[in-house]
């Protein structure tokens, strides 16, 4: 079984190793990062679970289901706050020599005139020429998860900062704002 440059087991798009009919998943595999195309290891449970399902399908039905890769979406609670990230942060983009622009916005978790609206910060990294999203980080007390999940989906689908402003959100003052924090982040990044 071939080992890749990162020390992980090299797999193809069906998660098959260099040995026919032998598959690998989870922390052990090396797979190209969807944004950079460079091999990387991803130590997160969500991609590993998806990989398990893909391998089960491929073992039963033949190599019919492809793995798209993972961009590293993660979240943690730090006391009362939530911090989350997806894709490539500025530090990693610098290390890789990838030109990027960044924007940081400060919004509220829901409509500011409704009680208990709490601060929510979003930082975006993106291609300064095309606006394609590279990554996002967010910190706040409420609603961080749904914002990062939406941005992660856009990144995986090749979305741009303009697409952030076009995402249709459900709106009611207790749970969101008429201009959602990711729309504000998109408008701001689009102005750079």
Task: Name each region found by the language model.
Residues 38-42, 58-87, 167-171:
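Active-site-proximal substrate-binding core of FAD-dependent oxidoreductases
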């Amino acid at each position: 079984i071939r080992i890749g440059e990162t020390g992980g087991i090299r797999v193809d798009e069906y998660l098959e190793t260099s040995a026919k009919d032998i598959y690998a998943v989870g922390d052990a595999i090396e797979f190209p990062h969807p944004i950079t195309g460079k091999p990387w290891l991803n130590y997160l449970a969500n991609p590993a679970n998806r990989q398990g399902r893909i391998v089960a399908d491929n073992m039963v039905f033949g190599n019919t289901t492809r793995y798209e890769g993972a961009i590293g979406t993660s979240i943690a609670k730090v006391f009362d706050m939530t911090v989350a990230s997806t894709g490539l942060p500025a530090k990693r983009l610098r290390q890789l020599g990838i030109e990027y622009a960044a924007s940081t916005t400060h919004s509220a978790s829901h409509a500011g005139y409704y009680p208990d609206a709490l601060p929510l910060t979003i930082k975006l990294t993106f291609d300064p020429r095309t606006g394609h999203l590279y990554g996002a980080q967010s910190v706040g007390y409420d609603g961080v998860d749904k914002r990062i999940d939406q941005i992660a989906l856009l990144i995986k689908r090749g979305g741009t900062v303009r697409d952030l402003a076009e995402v249709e959100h459900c709106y009611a003052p207790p749970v969101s704002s008429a201009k959602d924090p990711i729309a504000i982040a998109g408008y701001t990044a689009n102005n750079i």
